[in-house]
């Protein structure tokens, strides 16, 4: 069966989630039902991908919807930059000149507070760290300039065989027009596929893979999302994406990542909350509850396999 969770406008203008069909993988229908119970009734369109270590395919909820990625695309961008480093086209130690007056203004950019002066130099490795771990928008756009812009990133994603993901704009372009964010989209299948490509360690050198893993584990944004309800100390390598709020609606509250189970195996989870009329706290709680549910589901499978 196929699962589509759709937000529909009621007479009171509230967006309510309804279920018309279901798409599942070989995973237990129980996990699907548990996730449904989390998202039903929420004033949002919610997409979910869960790919357990024993699954040949991911469980997908709302698989045909296009979700704005927002800063989630910084994962894809980091993979492209590191890929070019592996090819010898870029060097992690090469520096980029940053002119304070010429970069995107009035945006989330902690790197601009870390440096003094009207102009300064930043190594590519530090731009990557700020872009991934801190979701820095200025660092992101400087990296885009190095690799050839959004079109180059789109082509790289397609070259990996990920067809249900598109990138057409950088941070500055999204800031100029909030509707542009919807053109940087992914399906939940695309979200699952980028995580799988990274988890399989087939796209990057060992050194680059280790660096990106470290930066994702050190992510400072979205602590109440995938990580929010997991046991303390659980290793989660993830990347968030967040839009602004306009007319009471949040276009994107996202998180996708790799959660390490107690036995060290990877659990891949992506949760995207689109066009939500819920509070930011509720949007993040949806993500946390889905991650917790998927994690506990895998723990029960492990427990069932353990000798008494």
From Swiss-Prot:
Activity control: Inhibited by the beta-lactamase-blocking agents clavulanic acid, tazobactam and sulbactam. Not inhibited by EDTA.
NCBIfam families membership: bla_class_A, blaPER, SubclassA2
Protein name per its UniProtKB record: Extended-spectrum beta-lactamase PER-1
UniProt keyword terms in alphabetical order: Antibiotic resistance, Hydrolase, Secreted, Signal
Record EC number: 3.5.2.6
Induction behaviour: Expression is up-regulated by an upstream promoter, active in P.aeruginosa, but probably not in E.coli.
GO biological process, one term: response to antibiotic
Catalysed conversion reaction: a beta-lactam + H2O = a substituted beta-amino acid
């Amino acid at each position: 069966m196929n699962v589509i969770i759709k937000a529909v406008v009621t007479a009171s203008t509230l967006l309510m989630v309804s279920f018309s069909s279901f798409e599942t993988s070989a995973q237990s229908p129980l996990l699907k039902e548990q996730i449904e119970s989390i998202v039903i009734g929420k004033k949002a369109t919610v997409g979910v991908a869960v790919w357990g270590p024993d699954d040949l395919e991911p469980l997908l909820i709302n698989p045909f919807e296009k979700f704005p990625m927002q800063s989630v695309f910084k994962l894809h961008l980091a993979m492209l930059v590191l890929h070019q480093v592996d090819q010898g086209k870029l060097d992690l130690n090469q520096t980029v000149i940053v002119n304070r007056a010429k970069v995107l203004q009035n945006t989330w950019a902690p790197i601009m507070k870390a440096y003094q002066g009207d102009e300064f130099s930043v190594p590519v490795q530090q731009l990557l760290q700020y872009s991934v771990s801190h979701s820095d928008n200025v660092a992101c756009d400087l990296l885009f300039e190095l690799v050839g812009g959004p079109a180059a990133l789109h082509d790289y994603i397609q070259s990996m065989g990920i067809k249900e993901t598109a990138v057409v704009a950088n941070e500055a372009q999204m800031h100029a027009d909030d509707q542009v964010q919807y053109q940087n989209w992914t399906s939940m299948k695309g979200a699952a596929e980028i995580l799988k490509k990274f988890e399989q360690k087939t796209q990057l050198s060992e050194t680059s893979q280790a660096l990106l893993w470290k930066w994702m584990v050190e992510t400072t944004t979205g602590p109440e999302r995938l990580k929010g309800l997991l046991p303390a100390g659980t290793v989660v390598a993830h990347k968030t994406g967040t839009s602004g709020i306009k007319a009471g609606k949040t276009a994107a509250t996202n998180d996708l990542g790799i959660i390490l189970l107690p036995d060290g195996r990877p659990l891949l989870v992506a949760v995207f909350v689109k066009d939500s009329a819920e509070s930011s706290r509720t949007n993040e709680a949806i993500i946390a509850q889905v991650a917790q549910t998927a994690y506990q589901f895998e723990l029960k499978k492990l427990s069932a396999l353990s000798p008494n």
